[in-house]
Amino acid sequence: MELFGTDGVRGKAGKLLSAQLSMRLAMAAGIYFRKNSRTNKIVVGKDTRRSGYMIENALVSGLTAVGYNVIQVGPMPTPAIAFLTEDLRCDAGIMISASHNPYYDNGIKFFNHQGDKLQPEDEKAIEAIFFDEQTIEENQKTDQDIGSSKRIDDVIGRYIVHLKNSFPKDLTLNGLRVVIDTANGAAYKVAPTVFSELGAEVFVINDEPNGFNINEKCGAMYPGELAKKVREYRADIGFALDGDADRLVVVDEKGKIVPGDLVIGALATYLKQEGMLQADAIVATVMSNKALEDYLATLGIELVRSNVGDKYVLDEMKKRGINFGGESSGHIIFGDYSKTGDGIVTALQITAYMLRSQKGASEILYPFSLYPSKMENVTVKEKKPLETIEEFPELQKRIEKSGIRSLIRYSGTENKLRILLEGKDQKKLEKLMEELIQFFKERLS
């Protein structure tokens, strides 16, 4: 059994993610982190789900049982926990969140002492300890070796200062009207405070979490309400965060939702203009539109592609000395300020670009047009390696020659083959998609 998925351990709270599993996972992680412990402290944060209380208490029990001292900071964005892990000199950080998922799901994400998400080898080592009864028993502490726990409520101030430090010192948001949808999630206090303190007139929606309404028809997954409110309040821009605030969706002053690849392109333009872009390159995933790549090339910026997931984006950034990257889904990483996607940092950089350029959101956020794209799923009986399917290599060569970009891969969670096609000719795309669906149905369904 594998515990870790693409972003930590995630599942339905009380079922897959039970109190028992959470406590044992905390013990296993604590045993692993203590091997290279420097301070014997771990910080734990959460979003606003009701199940967060259960999981938090289970994690604290598990960590203190193996001798760790725990700092509990309550509801905080995921990027805040990444920041605080390093800022508070902790051995590790743990965030309890299922990000954009519904309230009944929850998850546990780990950060190392530098605030980075764990590498696969770290996760495998924790899993091995989790399933090793003897190691768990041998590391259970007694007497004065049992750890302690304390709750600190004022660390939110440290994160707010950090966010404001990411905004240019010579600018203020005075006169700017901003609507923020906090998705009834972890940033319901932080996001409005930061924008207000920088001088903006802030209108906040979905900022009354009750444990069950996180991401409920609101936030980054449902930006429709934000679009209406931007028009209603005649705001200059709108920002929708998800439940743990590592993702951002942007709405311009006309109430139009801006595609993520355009946001990435606009921010790359800004960083290049300001001389802040390192290595003349950015990282995006295999899902980003080819038009982004072609546009960046006109600016002398290389687009490096990574696998899907912000931790893979960050890995590629580190490898190549790049300080900016993101996913079209809204996870955007400014390497100078954050080790993970940070929706609030991204929102601040967009407003800085507006102020620097003295232009409205709609004037800066559409630097190019996306190429037509089409995505379809084919249900499959088995996930045969694609390269072993007869005639597939020849078909791939033909697609490449046609000038159409294709991404064909199996879903990680379902018995489905996902087909993404992109190109300048919509009719050509549709014809090829029909051919591919038929091809794979005959061979895999």
Curated annotation (Swiss-Prot):
Pfam family, one: PGM_PMM_IV
Active site residues per record: S99
EC number assigned by the record: 5.4.2.10
Record PTM: Activated by phosphorylation.
Keywords of this entry: Isomerase, Magnesium, Metal-binding, Phosphoprotein
Domain of life: Bacteria
Identification of the protein by name: Phosphoglucosamine mutase
GO BP terms: carbohydrate metabolic process; peptidoglycan biosynthetic process; UDP-N-acetylglucosamine biosynthetic process
Residues engaged in binding Mg(2+): S99, D242, D244, D246
One GO molecular-function entry: phosphomannomutase activity
A Gene Ontology cellular-component term: cytosol
Phosphoserine modification, residue list: S99
Cofactor list: Mg(2+)
Free-text remark on how the cofactor is bound: Binds 1 Mg(2+) ion per subunit.
Role of this protein: Catalyzes the conversion of glucosamine-6-phosphate to glucosamine-1-phosphate.
PANTHER family, alphabetized: PHOSPHOGLUCOMUTASE (ALPHA-D-GLUCOSE-1,6-BISPHOSPHATE-DEPENDENT), PHOSPHOHEXOSE MUTASE
UniProt family annotation: Belongs to the phosphohexose mutase family.
Catalytic reactions on record: alpha-D-glucosamine 1-phosphate = D-glucosamine 6-phosphate
